[in-house]
Structure formats: C-alpha cells, structure tokens
Amino acid sequence: MKNLLKQLVETESPSHVKAAVDRVGSIVAGECRKLNAQVEIIPNKKTGDHVLAKWGNDSKNGVLILCHMDTVFPLGTLKTFPYKEADGKIHGPGTLDMKAGIVITLSAISSLLSKGTAAPRPVTALFTSDEEIGSLTSRKHIESLAREASIVFVMEGALLDGSLKTWRKGVGEFNVKVKGRAAHAGGDHKEGRNAIEEMAHQIIAIQKLTDYEKQTTLNVGIINGGTASNVVPEESTIEVDVRVMQPGEWERLEGEMKKLKPALDGTSIEVSGGLNRPPMPFGEVSQAAFKKASQIAKDVLGVELKAGGTGGASDGNFVAPLGIPVLDGMGAIGEGYHSDREYIFANSLEERAKLLAALIENW
C-alpha cells in the first residue's frame, strides 16, 4: 500500500494541469486492470480524464466508490514538501486529500478478490480529475452512477478521531462588482465616485448575513480595486465564500444579495454567482446507512464507528439530494489539508481498507 501511495504522491497532479492528472489516471487505470476491472477512460479536453472501473456485469443496486486524483498543490511542491514517512505518519502533498483514499479503495477490492469473496452487489469506482475545482466535468457522471447505486462511499479523509463525515455544508460563491467614477484624487476628488468606499459598505452588509444558529457563513475572502493611490477608484470586486446547511438558506441569501443597494450616489452594484455543491445533511437515509455500517463494522471488525461532519464540501454533496445513502470520510485519518502540514497516520491505511472491504462484502 505504501509503495503505491508513494508513487501516487510523487506523481504530482494539480487540477489545472491535464497532463499531470492524466499521469495519475494512467497509474490508477493500470492498477484497476490488475484487479480484473472493466476500465473506461472518460476523456476531457481541458482537465484530466476520469477513470471508471467496474467489478461485476451490472452497476444497478451496487456499491459506488468516489475518489479524486487531482490535488491543490502546484507542480514542484515536492521540492519543498517531499513524500516522507516518519514517526508513524506519512507526509506529502495530497496524501490525505486524497491519494490515500485511492490506495485504500484498491487495497480493499484486492483483498476481497484475493480471498475469493464475491461481493453481494457489483462495485463501481469512479476516479475523477476535477474535484478540487468544483467537479465541473465529473458531476454529471457522479450523479448518473449514484442514481443506480444502493450505497455511495466517498474516500475523502476521515475526521481526526476517525469519525465518518455523515454531513457536510453546501458551498457556493457570490461575486460582487461595484462601478464608480474615476477622477484625479487631488484635482477632481469631488467628481469621483469611490468604488472601494462603496464596496466597504456592501462588505459590512454581506458579512451580517452570517447566521451561526443556522450554520450559515459568508466570508469576503478576496477584494480588488483601484489602479493608483492618486486615482479615485472606478471599480472594485469581491469574492464571497458561502456555506449553508439548512434547506432554503441559499435561496434566502440569493434574495438578500439581490436586494443590495448602493450607499453612494453615482455607483452601481452587480451580483453574480451560484451554489456549487448543495448541503449533505445527516437525514433519515444517511442515518439508516450509518446504522447499517456501524453494525457491520462492529460484527466483522469489532470496531465502533463514529459520526461527524464538516463545513467543507465534497462530491458526496452531489449524492445526498438524490436520496441515495452516502457515507463520506471513508479514507485515511490525518490532518493538514491543503497545506505543507498534510499527513496521514500510516496505520490508518490498512485499518480503513479493512473497513471498506467489510462494508462492500456485507452491504
């Protein structure tokens, strides 16, 4: 397992570099073929190709496993943040998010095949290329395959205590553009309409839409504007990250954003954006799935599963609204996502592979 993980981590795969992600895809496809899978390469022009692997003749009522091959780290990251194993941890870009999840998936299937165990349901694994940039090309494939599945396992990293991620917030973004009027800051200051000043008023109004009781947060994370300190800025833009949990919250926020009005005469506001991933609530369907998984884990492995959640989103968010049970956080245990502190606990590779194999075999 560690050898394959090392190979995958040292094959850097930033989302926007198609050739790099395809190199990982080639490795994954090869490993799946070694396990006698029916492998299909789903091509993309600008982003990496997706890899679809099937065990069994029919995917209906089967098990769907979701993995992604892309990472947030740019090419060359290995020079300053190399793959390293020390003190029971494996460090490196993409170890936790989520190349360990790929290794765990392949190991679980390999173990079932090696002991001649036939899963009661067909197994399909989709390895996507663009999860870190919104799953723009993979979403339709995820939703199509999920509609045929009886259970979906998402191989993102677990919570630090090993808990599965049974709920996730939905994530979206608003982009706000303010137009003012440029003028010389010394000679014609009065004639100008300061777009940054106007945007300051709007930022305060937007941040006030955060509602912690409803688990709704808005974060103005990027602001741009102006060309020089001696020019009254004509334009300013912001990017707003949005996280929602409750039904109807996104619609409420859309309505509030459309109501934004200029505070200064002679300025205008333009709002755009959308919800990328809907919420993944821990509703009745997923509660039943977690209960079943917990019983299997206890009976087969003597392991007690725990349920948790996070404000971050994944491809599991696309599955929940379809009414299909989904269990996320099935991957390795570690921390430091998207940073040079990213690592997994080495022993969690085998532990989570055993868990996934048990769930596939007994679902």
Residue map of PLM features:
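Acidic/histidine-rich catalytic neighborhood of metal-dependent amide-processing enzymes
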Residues: 98-169
